[in-house]
Design a protein with these regions (language model features):
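Short strand->helix junction
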Residues: 60, 200-201
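Amphipathic alpha-helical coiled-coil segments that mediate homodimerization
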Residues: 97-132
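A conserved regulatory-domain signal marking ACT and ACT-like small-molecule sensing domains
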Residues: 2-106, 118
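Amphipathic alpha-helical "output/dimerization" segments
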Residues: 203-219
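Extended, charged low-complexity segments
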Residues: 195-199, 210
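GAF sensory domains
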Residues: 131-196
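Hydrophobic, Leu/Ile/Phe/Ala-enriched alpha-helical segments that form helix-helix packing faces
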Residues: 74, 78, 115-123, 215-218
Length: 219
């Protein structure tokens, strides 16, 4: 489980694994409410083969509550596991793939850049970047605000660029950066998108499949 907090941030994104049966979501909502949390949004991320479901929650916590309190409240429930909790921009929402697609098709010449800019919200990544490998010297051509600076040498670490894959990067893979998990997927013959999470958790197979699908729609 990953916990990332900020003193002036009281909106959190939580990812939970819970039993896929009637009443589970209600029990989680009751547990969250018991510590003063308000649920703003819920989204099903993945249903697993073992009878569990992975859900994302956006919750408000009162200023006097630490995120550990809601983690404990949820994990006291049978079969519930908190995968991670992280600060979230106030007013942010759980943006769907369909909304991302609509924005991409509204401006086809810049569909790749649009997808990159939306990835931190749609896929709960900390950053995203567009890598151009057209001249055998990979370089970042467009990035979100929190993305690392990628020299050609660092960008080359995300190869191969012709297939979708995960990559785990050790601390200091880029100056000042800690352990990072990332996904690489081709956009066009010469361009790929990379999304990353500092400190994890690893991207689920369903998230990778969704990213691959959206990337395939970039012309």
């Amino acid at each position: 489980m990953v916990i990332a907090v900020g003193k002036d941030v009281h909106v959190f994104l939580m990812r939970l694994t819970l039993p896929d049966r009637p009443g589970s979501l209600g029990s989680v909502a009751t547990a969250m409410g018991s510590v003063g949390a308000d649920i703003n949004a819920v989204e099903i991320v993945e249903k697993t083969t073992d009878g569990s479901v992975v859900d994302d929650f956006i919750v408000d916590l009162p200023p006097n509550q630490l995120p550990e309190t809601i983690v404990t409240a949820c994990q006291n429930l049978a079969g519930v596991r908190v995968e991670w909790i992280a600060r979230y921009p106030e007013g942010g929402g759980l943006q769907s793939d369909l909304e991302a697609l609509e924005r991409m098709t509204a401006d086809p010449p810049h569909a790749a850049e649009t997808l990159v800019s939306l990835c931190p919200v749609v896929f709960r990544s900390h950053w995203a970047t567009l890598i151009d490998a057209s001249e055998n010297i990979p370089r970042s051509s467009y990035s979100t605000t929190l993305a690392p600076d990628l020299t050609p040498e660092i960008a080359a670490r995300f190869a191969p660029f012709d297939t979708t894959h995960r990559i785990d990067l050790e601390s200091d893979w880029s100056p000042g950066w800690g352990d990072t998990t990332a996904v690489v997927t081709p956009l066009t013959q010469d361009r790929v998108i990379v999304i990353g999470r500092l400190g994890g958790p690893a991207f689920l197979d369903s998230e990778i499949a969704r990213l691959h699908h959206l990337a395939a729609l970039v012309k």
